[in-house]
Amino acid sequence: MRTSQYLLSTLKETPADAEVISHQLMLRAGMIRKLASGLYTWLPTGLRVLKKVENIVREEMNNANAIEVCMPVVQPADLWQESGRWEQYGPELLRFVDRGDRPFVLGPTHEEVITDLIRNEISSYKQLPLNFFQIQTKFRDEVRPRFGVMRSREFLMKDAYSFHTSQESLQATYEAMYEAYSKIFSRMGLDFRPVHADTGSIGGSASHEFQVLADSGEDDIVFSTGSDFAANIELAEAVAPAEPRAAASEELRIVDTPNAKTIAELVEQFQLPVTKTVKTLLVRAKEESGHKLVALLVRGDHELNEIKAEKLPQVAAPLVFATEEEIRAIVGAGPGSLGPVNLQVPVVADRSVAAMSDFGAGANIDGKHYFGINWERDLPLPQVADIRNVVEGDASPDGKGTLLIKRGIEVGHIFQLGTKYSEAMKATVQGEDGRNQVLTMGCYGIGVTRVVAAAIEQNHDERGIIWPDAIAPFQVAILPMNMHKSFRVQALAEELYNTLRSHGIDVILDDRKERPGVMFADMELIGVPHSIVIGDRNLDSEEIEYKNRRVGEKQMIKTGEVIDFLLGQIKR
């Protein structure tokens, strides 16, 4: 590609509405342009990257024996009503009617469509297992699209769906998809981790996320220092303290605390160790529990894990925190004065709270706290459960090492769905015994557009993007200095350009009449990994300058060795 025949729409200034670095650099590098909230046009440079990501995904899915299909973005509402997700999905599901007043949706996912297809096409266990995938546009009407293509409304996704007659068959395909995903992100040159994850609204029995590590990530990822254990913080078990609870050494006493409505204020004003305080959080209970609220207790320096709390049998899902009005109606005090002593609602204590002694908590009277609280002496030990987020230094759940926490960006997710959709939609086949059998399903997604943004978040510096070779828009940039004034500079540039193309290398020749500084800045901004600078002075000694975008090194290469050198660099 020649810049004179290409749309290189780079920007010097960062647009004011771009919050994260990937959004800023995708705009500045001329990869995308905003059309409306959460909607983006992909320009040539961005599309080249997107297509390379897409091709790697497609190749590895084919290698894993998945079969490519293409399903409509527009889906009839009756399929969503049949699966039960019409009511469950909420406002992110864009619903509309056609001219015949028939209801439809813009698909955010395709479980219903693929299940409908399979129940009409597959009739016998002999045809299974099968795994179908597509790379297709999705639409989710996000309440607040942000971060560019990281959280947009329209996006490109690879989704795959497998169908089985046994859990063993599903497990085999699940493991094959796990390996395929690992190969995909490795080929892209990304630093990623597969982690145990919650199944969320998709449902199912097992789930792994594939997280690209980046300081700007939205997810907290937990790792063990002593094993390969890794999990999303939502799912990481907080192990119970190994030490037994210490004996009581303080008397129970009530203290006036009119200006201490938070744990931080209590600690500061009364010089209490934060590890000797307890937070009491009231959430709505399930109707069938016979109670309106449930109290959840976590240590003052810990955070409630809402995913874990939501799975408690007496807690309403989704988790809803009680309002101050609801709290006062039942307890008679505000949220800043709550505690477990004489609390007239069901109580669930985190494992770490159950191991505490001589601790402080609200007295359920405005402006008062109890200090010196001890289990069994001052109140019975309530139900105990793991309901907190782990913190760095906690023991690993597998008993090997301690935990570290890093930030990650979710780019892939695989699920063992089981029979959630096939049961609801009556997707069956004739089994080996001649009876109808409900299909067992798996689903496997990769956010293709999100991968592009995540790669930038992980690979950039103050000058722009630093693409891994496999997904760079161009692998090599040829930068001839004043080529329009020097025949030999122009001749070598053309020769290298044509030779590299003949070797299948994506190369861009900057043949603009621009200052060298502009040419260098643009190629660094769009992230070309390898650059060749051709100048008259260096040609006197039959040399050119090579620049590596990632390590920043420069070296002189003999003109006759340039091609072999570059091929070696790109393959390395």
UniProtKB/Swiss-Prot annotation:
Catalysis: reaction(s):
tRNA(Pro) + L-proline + ATP = L-prolyl-tRNA(Pro) + AMP + diphosphate
Q: What is its EC number?
A: 6.1.1.15
- CDD domains reported for this sequence: ProRS-INS, ProRS_anticodon_short, ProRS_core_prok
What GO MF terms are annotated?
Answer: aminoacyl-tRNA deacylase activity; ATP binding; proline-tRNA ligase activity
Against InterPro entries, the record matches this protein to: aa-tRNA-synt_IIb (IPR002314), aa-tRNA-synth_II (IPR006195), aa-tRNA-synth_II/BPL/LPL (IPR045864), Anticodon-bd (IPR004154), Anticodon-bd_dom_sf (IPR036621), Pro-tRNA-ligase_IIa (IPR002316), Pro-tRNA-synth_IIa_bac-type (IPR004500), Pro-tRNA-Synthase_IIa_type1 (IPR023717)
Its main localization is cytoplasm
Q: Does the keyword Aminoacyl-tRNA synthetase apply?
A: yes
One GO cellular component assignment for this chain's record is: cytosol
Any idea which UniProt keywords this protein has? Aminoacyl-tRNA synthetase, ATP-binding, Cytoplasm, Ligase, Nucleotide-binding, Protein biosynthesis
Q: Keyword check for Aminoacyl-tRNA synthetase, yes or no.
A: yes
Q: Where in the cell is it found?
A: Cytoplasm
GO terms in the biological process aspect are:
prolyl-tRNA aminoacylation
Q: In UniProt terms, what function does this protein have?
A: Catalyzes the attachment of proline to tRNA(Pro) in a two-step reaction: proline is first activated by ATP to form Pro-AMP and then transferred to the acceptor end of tRNA(Pro). As ProRS can inadvertently accommodate and process non-cognate amino acids such as alanine and cysteine, to avoid such errors it has two additional distinct editing activities against alanine. One activity is designated as 'pretransfer' editing and involves the tRNA(Pro)-independent hydrolysis of activated Ala-AMP.
User: What is the annotated quaternary arrangement, including any partners?
Assistant: Homodimer.
Recorded family membership: Belongs to the class-II aminoacyl-tRNA synthetase family. ProS type 1 subfamily.
HAMAP family registered for this protein in UniProt: Pro_tRNA_synth_type1 (MF_01569)
The record's domain comment reads: Consists of three domains: the N-terminal catalytic domain, the editing domain and the C-terminal anticodon-binding domain.
Protein's recorded name? Proline--tRNA ligase
Q: Which organism is it from?
A: Serratia proteamaculans (strain 568)
Gene for this protein? proS
